[in-house]
Design a protein with these regions (language model features):
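Glycine-rich short-loop/terminal segments
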Residues: 1-58, 123-124, 129-138
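Active-site-proximal loop/helix of nucleotide/amide-processing enzymes and allied scaffolds
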Residues: 44-139
Length: 139
């Protein structure tokens, strides 16, 4: 699970790998990677998503929410700026209402932007844990 979602290293930015979802299915002792989601833009897109194929009864699904972000600072091309507003556009960290409504049982969402793992079902978020305490990835 962790090795799949860690394709987004959690450092934010505009690279494609940081602006798409990764995930898969846990079936017994197997972890099956789902096709990565399409690249999104946190300034323009409401969300990004991943599609898990062939979900069976008893499967556990997991996916990431991207760390990508766009930071817009005031333009200082003409000289010194006093005041101004910096805007940050980023992806939602916690499971969305859609994630919760589509839960097939107990599912996992890895928030790559803040390193939190959300454990949730159709009733909502049941627990959170820092990813660094969840499991140590292969090196």
């Amino acid at each position: 699970m962790v090795n799949i979602v860690n394709q987004d290293d959690g450092s934010g930015g505009t690279a494609d790998r940081k602006n798409r979802e990764y995930g898969g299915i846990v079936r017994g002792n197997l972890v099956l990677e789902s096709p990565m989601g399409k690249v999104g833009n946190p300034k323009k897109d409401l969300d990004v998503y991943i599609t898990h194929r062939d979900i069976r009864y008893g499967d556990i699904t997991f996916h990431s929410h991207p760390s990508g972000q766009i930071i817009e600072r005031p333009d200082n091309a003409g000289g010194t700026i006093i005041g101004g507003v910096t805007k940050t556009f980023q992806w939602v960290r916690a499971p969305s209402i859609d994630d919760i409504n589509k839960a097939s049982g107990t599912d996992y969402e890895f928030s790559r932007g803040d390193g939190i793992v959300y454990i949730y079902n159709r009733s909502g978020v049941q627990a959170t844990i820092p990813q660094k305490r969840f499991i140590t990835p292969k090196k």
